[in-house]
């Protein structure tokens, strides 16, 4: 942080403090590819509204510039490239008062407890039951009028007004109750609660141990082992429709079928967790590269399984994400996997489920070798749940969302998906050949006073359970701007694929005006796999 003197206060919505582990490039240290890079690329390539001036300056400064994702895809391990913008490496550098807002169904939420705990400057935070959206226009419901809180925050720091915002506890958290699995929900049951900050002193870790009979209990079992065959195309449901750790995920049973699964007995009373659950595992693999994925879920009495938390781990990062090392086949080693920030109340009569797998495709790029992994039970393999004993706490009195201002000539056109991003629309599998295909789509648009802007995107992921090294993602993104007497089209086409040793990147940018091709440029690169 540069902390310029004129910067008096910050509000960060859906932010991260770690661009390597906790962003959309290498989630949990594992390669992730989605449609976002194409939409962002075309936004960067085109000139600004309302003139959309197409000239040599635009070509030089925007359209002809090398796609920045080509640089990112070469940075496959943590290190200096990511350190430049990682607040997590230097919390003391943030000296400006900051207000952090996140959502339980957004991929950017882990920074909230870390910043509350580590930043010395004034910090306030809230996290609610919404996705990657502003809280006044949330999905899912309920929302709240965060703009009122923003005015209170800025009035205090910019105008010196006594708004009372610093008299309140620092952390407002929405505690989630059970809901059925997604992918689409009208709303989430729960309640708001004030907490003084983070960590919360009354939270206690409860250890649960996977057992040889696939039970999850308070008692550590004798030593034994469970083996799991790697199915590279599994995990679609665990990744959710947008394919990241921020979705209302599907019923977890299809992914659980390819996982090691451990369940508690039905709970005798409600159990609340709040924090970052941890999985401490002793594992081994018979291949030099393997990823592990852990998920915590709620099994309802009717058998449906709702994902509560999860995380992935690149096994070659077991000692360091900066200096990865191949796995020594057959040799057990410990993993500590911190799941992503969560809140949940497991209801009486429900079961807690812990699942371990080696694939979460297409959210995470598959490792290239066929293999079998082993989970060694006993000897410290366990799950730590951050449990919260009941304590009567004050509740925030947030205002309900208010209608936003209606700007003349501005209208958001209907989007295909609730998230506004490409979501899984079809899944195809061929058991005979091992081939699998997942297609994600979205479309929408905005009407402006100067014209109409529309977009359409399609992303096709393919892999093969018999040869996961040969995995690919093919995407297309099309933006159309309709002006009076003029139609502009920007197109981006990406083919990203892998073999055992390398990634292959080909990207084409295209501009058309009134149906005629104005400019087209293609970039290609061959990138060594760096422990991915």
Language model region names:
Residues 2-7, 25-31, 114-119, 140-145, ...:
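Short secondary-structure boundary/capping segments
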Residues 2-93:
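Accessory cap/linker subdomain of secreted extracellular hydrolases
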Residues 3, 92-94, 119, 199-202:
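Extracellular/periplasmic catalytic domains that process cell-envelope and extracellular macromolecules
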Residues 6-9, 119-140:
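Catalytic cores of eukaryotic secretory-pathway lumenal/extracellular enzymes that build
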Residues 67-127:
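Serine-hydrolase catalytic core
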Residues 104-105, 130-131, 359:
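Acidic beta-to-alpha connecting loop that harbors the catalytic carboxylate
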